[in-house]
Amino acid sequence: MTTTLLRTADELHARVRHGRRAVVMTMGALHEGHATLIRTAREIAGAEGEVVVTVFVNPLQFGRGEDLDRYPRTLDADLKIAEAAGADVVFAPSADEVYPGGEPQVRISAGPMGERLEGAFRPGHFDGMLTVVGKLLHLTRPDVALYGQKDAQQLALIRRMARDLNFGVEIVGVPTVREDDGLALSSRNRYLAADERRTALALSQALFAGRDRHAAQEALRARAREVPATRARAEALSAIGESRAAADAHAVAKATPAGTSGPAAVRCAARLVLEEAARLQPPLVLDYLGLVDPSDFTEIPDDFTGEAVLAVAARVGTTRLIDNIPLTFGAAS
């Protein structure tokens, strides 16, 4: 199968469509994470459908002092990856094609959710992201659009935009793809020197420490519910402060203040890893660590039940990285 490169919306609209059209939006510099999105899109579209991959480095998403000029542009390599993963079309428009009158005067506002976490550190970023996603949805006219869960706040905002503005497109989130050592795949990973990459592992390690802490608490609560309300049950509950879900989380569990549980314990376990990474050379410089409700990205309270996202952003050298994992908090016993 040969992937077709298109540069204009007119070329894309002229294609005869059969079945569903699935779109994967990227800024290029494709890697295995993008390939996973494309393969998933191929499964959704089916043999009779069409998979379109957009490649567009959107200037509206980059703030002053960010890495627009050095963001990698590797279209030839991107075409090969997209073709191998099953894309029918790579749509790589110019800035003039997407913004024919220059930067748009009217933009889509991300609202309060877009001002939290990433939005607090990158003012205007989500407005620019939603504006180009909205334009690309209009230009590509898909039945379904797929986005990686690594950018959890972006995914949540796109879902909200599609719902609030009646875009009539199904939005699908695809799980984060990681290297063998846990580092989330990102186009920006190529900026990292070897020593910076070792420090960058602290992002995923912090998330895993929080996840393991949470799993240990849930396991002990489940065990305690099975024990009669006697001294044995009390001992099982009090053991939370010294238990661990895995051997490599034991030091974190020991360091967590006595009596800390629930979301507070998850935050504490993750933060301990990040604080240790801040003492490395080169150091990890934390932007934020949040344990949030994915519906609005506000911090969850200690009595929270339901789905949550543990998210982190940090800089190593000149490279800024983000990561997150989902967690589920059950009803208290």
UniProtKB/Swiss-Prot annotation:
Complex formation: Homodimer.
Residues binding (R)-pantoate, per UniProt: 61, 154
Keyword set, alphabetical order: ATP-binding, Cytoplasm, Ligase, Nucleotide-binding, Pantothenate biosynthesis
GO term, biological process aspect, one: pantothenate biosynthetic process
Annotated metabolic or biological route of this protein: Cofactor biosynthesis; (R)-pantothenate biosynthesis; (R)-pantothenate from (R)-pantoate and beta-alanine: step 1/1
Substrates-to-products reaction catalysed: (R)-pantoate + beta-alanine + ATP = (R)-pantothenate + AMP + diphosphate + H(+)
Keyword presence, Cytoplasm: yes
Group of enzyme by EC: ligase
Localisation: Cytoplasm
Main location: cytoplasm
PANTHER family attached to this UniProt entry: CYTIDYLATE KINASE/PANTOATE-BETA-ALANINE LIGASE (PTHR21299), PANTOATE--BETA-ALANINE LIGASE (PTHR21299:SF1)
Further remark: The reaction proceeds by a bi uni uni bi ping pong mechanism.
InterPro entries: Pantoate_ligase, Pantoate_ligase_C, Rossmann-like_a/b/a_fold
Known function: Catalyzes the condensation of pantoate with beta-alanine in an ATP-dependent reaction via a pantoyl-adenylate intermediate.
Molecular function GO terms recorded: ATP binding; pantoate-beta-alanine ligase activity
Binding-site list for ATP: 27-34, 148-151, 177, 185-188
Annotated protein name in UniProt: Pantothenate synthetase
Gene Ontology cellular component terms for the protein in this record: cytosol
Active-site residues from the entry: 34 (proton donor)
Chain positions recorded as beta-alanine binding sites: 61
Similarity comment: family membership: Belongs to the pantothenate synthetase family.
EC number: 6.3.2.1
